[in-house]
Amino acid sequence: MELALNEDGRSWVRTRAWVEGQLAPGERIVAAERLRGGWTSEMRRLRVEGPGTGRDLVLRSFVLPFFLEHADGLLTREADVLDLLGPTTVPTAGLVAVDSTGAHCDHPSLLMTLLPGTVRLDDGPDADHRAELLASQLAAIHRTAADGRRRPRGYQAWTAPDRVRVPEHTTRPELWRRAVHVLRQAPPPYTGRFLHRDFHPGNVLFSGEGPGLRISGVVDWVETSWGPADLDVAHCSTALALLHGAPAGLRFPDRYRAAGGELAPSAGARRHWRLLDALAFAPDAEKVAVPWRELGRTDLTPAVLTTRLEDYVAGVLARP
C-alpha cells in the first residue's frame, strides 16, 4: 500500500517510517484508510500484518497551522490521559507511541490501538438509549482520580461575552442579549472534576443493538481538563440539542444526575455553564456540523442548526 502522499499531497514518508519503527519485528503497514468525523486532525486506520498476525492501529496527525502550533501540548496531554485511563473501566485506546513535536514524523502524531464500534449520530429509535448511556459514561469519567502531577490543566472557556457571534438574521435578538449578559457575570465557584472537555456523540463509539447496545470507546482526549462537571454536561447537552432538537439537550442534565452525576447546586450556576458552552457554537455550529455531515447528517444545514441552537438557549434561560 502506497502511503507516501495523502489526498492533499502532503508527504507521509517520515511518518510511515516512524510508525513502522514502533511495530513488532516482521510487522508492516499493508493498508491505510482515512477516518472521517473530525476536523482538528487527520485520522487514519492502519492495517498492520506480520507473520501469522494482523491488527489495526489509529494514527492521529495535526496538519493545520493552528493545531501545529499547539500540537505538543495537545498530543502530550492525550498520551498522558490514555496512560492514566488504561487501568480504569473507561473504554479508551491504548497508547503505542507519540511524536508530539514532529521530530520524527512529517507532522506531530500519536499512534494508538483501534477501538471497536462506530459513531452513531442518527435520529433512530435508540437515540434516547444512547443518551442514557452517554450520561452514565460521562458520570464515570468524572469519577476518575487524578491527583498531583496526573491532574490535567484547568479548563479553558471557549467563548467570552465579546466573542459571541449572534446569528445575522436572528428574529430573537433579546434572547441573545440575555444569554450574553449571563456570561458577563463572574464564573460560579465549583468543585473540580476530571473532564473529557469535548464529550459528545461524535467522540463516542457504540457497539451492539437494542438491549445489547453499549459504549465501546471514548476518543479524542486532547482537551482533557480539570473543572466543573457541569461544563462537560453542558457540552454534550448542546451537541444533543443540535443533533436531535432542543428537548434532547435540555433532558441530558437530568439523565446525568439519574446516572449518579453531581451538578452545581444552584440553578444560576448550572445556567452559566450551559450558556458558556452553547454560545461557543454560535451562530451555526459549523465546526461540528462539517464532520457530522460527513458522517451522514446532511440534514444539519446552517439554518437548522441555528434554529436548534436558539431554541436550546431559550430553553436554558427559561429553566428555573
For each of these PLM feature ranges, what is it?
Residues M1-G9:
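Actinobacteria-biased recognition of intrinsically disordered, low-complexity terminal regions
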Residues L3-A4, P65-G73, A289-T301:
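Short, flexible/disordered intra-domain loops and linkers
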Residues R10-G26, A127, A140-R197, P201-L213, ...:
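An alpha-helical support segment within catalytic cores of ATP-dependent transferases
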Residues G26-E33:
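Conserved N-terminal boundary motif of the eukaryotic protein kinase catalytic domain
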Residues E33-G154, E174:
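ATP-binding pocket architecture of kinase catalytic cores
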Residues R36, T40-V48, V58-L59, L95, ...:
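Active-site acidic catalytic loop and adjacent metal/ATP-binding pocket
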Residues L231-E262, L276-E294:
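Active-site activation/catalytic loop segments of kinase-like enzymes and analogous catalytic loops
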Residues D284-P320:
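Helical subdomain adjoining the active site within ATP-dependent kinase catalytic cores
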